[in-house]
């Protein structure tokens, strides 16, 4: 259990605030500078893994090179008792991923502001030839004031180094992985730009562009499928903004932005009036052919190198000479063999007797040694001093006292100055500081009811508010915990207080598709309640309204009512017959009946007034009947024209009964 441990006698670990595959992150307090810091500790099961230790050190080297307001600062790096740790800036807030889950798709202005900060940070890293290789919302922190910080350079690498993944393994998170990384190839600055484009897509739509049943399925989509248009989920995205995403996520790195600064400049001007409706980004057809990028195998890097040792063969003459010399030497050695054995045996016996009588007893009789005075020393210094003198140091006895500083040595047993045998056991009495009492458990209590008591009892009380299922105002967690011994008057108390259950604030779903909104709600464990209504203004299948309204705080399991448009309401039509329409004949000369031309016009659901439905001639008055197909809330109409003069023009109302 690392909570409560001090690293380097300086960084006190307070609580775990995050974790990943290779390391855990703790909130800690820097006792020297009096500030909170984040301490990233390599998991103990990897502390003997050389590859993970190298990666851990690589993160420290990467970040210490950088100094940028949107990159987490690195303060210190160290190793203690097999614990490898990095000390970094503590950023209060949440990850960008948590922010997106809570808020959904972000307003365009806010999303562009975040992307400006992100591209600025990556441009700075790229300037120092550092490629992050794992850009994703999970590795980006956002403060309450909207400032973002890029973190987790654990798999970052210098572009001058070989960046080919060994044994075709893939580094990075599959939803944000560039095609070249998915192939197991080289990761470069354009790989980070691709990941930035995916993050921008998620900010503006509330979702990732690709999903699948497995990591392999998603990686294949990055390799083979074009990024879908973000307008499919957010029709308010201007063309200039969509173009940035499409260019950043081009399959071929050659077609992407060539630098993070170039992408940043496009983001800064994306909402200029002259750019809003610019032409869609596309890759010329002659450049769209798929090019297979081979994986660079490790053995290819060394194919011209050989480790064989070459032995040059001698001549047959030389071999014969060596053979004769060897035979002669063997004959001489046999003659002297027994004489040498006798002399050697005698000498060994003489030496053994001498050692047994003089030297060897000194090895087994311990020397007398005076116990040194280590009182007032730091514990580790005292241990080293005693070990150097040949003593064995046992576990320390902790003594609480106001007279000796915490951690310093009070005395030893045997006492200083006493003469004892070498290798004797020495017990150190170490100061535990002032008398301590067991920490009180405040969890579950209401903060306001005990705030005055806490402020009087402890040196300092720091309160953090978090979302929790426990009642608002209840203390959820505390540091120190109730199993620790503390000096109350000198103790700083940190408490975490519930501000109510975890809340989700859905965005505005207006004109979302039914599938998109149900997917969004299900992902956040909200219950969609779908209802349907006719609408003259919203296309069929799109969201008309929602309840509760956008931005309302909700908790998991809450119901959200969504009204989906059925399109315009169909209107009823009826057939109306008008009988006995009289067409009068009018002669200008008495007694003479000259034929007159009659044109009959009709307007209803099936006919317009732009041409006559019938033309006839009459020599006397006539009567006709007309049928009209009339829709609810509309009218029919007919017109009679005689010799070019309109003589009848009437409306036919929709029957109310």
UniProtKB/Swiss-Prot annotation:
The active site is at residue 134. Residues 367-657 are extracellular. It is found in: Spore membrane. One of its GO terms (cellular component) is plasma membrane. GO terms for biological process: cellular response to peptidoglycan; protein phosphorylation; signal transduction; spore germination. The modification Phosphoserine is found at residue 214. The chain crosses the membrane at residues 346-366. The modification Phosphothreonine is found at residues 162-163, 165, 167, 290. The record marks 40 as: Required for activity. The keyword Glycoprotein does not apply. ATP binds at residues 17-25, 40. Residues 1-345 are cytoplasmic. Residues 11-282 form the Protein kinase domain. One of its GO terms (molecular function) is protein serine/threonine kinase activity. It catalyses: L-seryl-[protein] + ATP = O-phospho-L-seryl-[protein] + ADP + H(+); L-threonyl-[protein] + ATP = O-phospho-L-threonyl-[protein] + ADP + H(+). The C-terminal extracellular domain containing the PASTA repeats binds peptidoglycan. PubMed:18984160 shows that peptidoglycan fragments serve as a novel mechanism of interspecies bacterial signaling that likely indicates the presence of growing bacteria and thus serve as a signal for dormant cells that growth-promoting conditions exist. Homodimer. Protein kinase that is responsible for triggering spore germination in response to muropeptides, signaling bacteria to exit dormancy. PrkC is thus a germination receptor that binds peptidoglycan fragments containing m-Dpm (meso-diaminopimelate), which act as spore germinants. Probably autophosphorylates and phosphorylates FusA (EF-G, elongation factor G); the latter modification is likely necessary for germination in response to peptidoglycan. This is Serine/threonine-protein kinase PrkC.
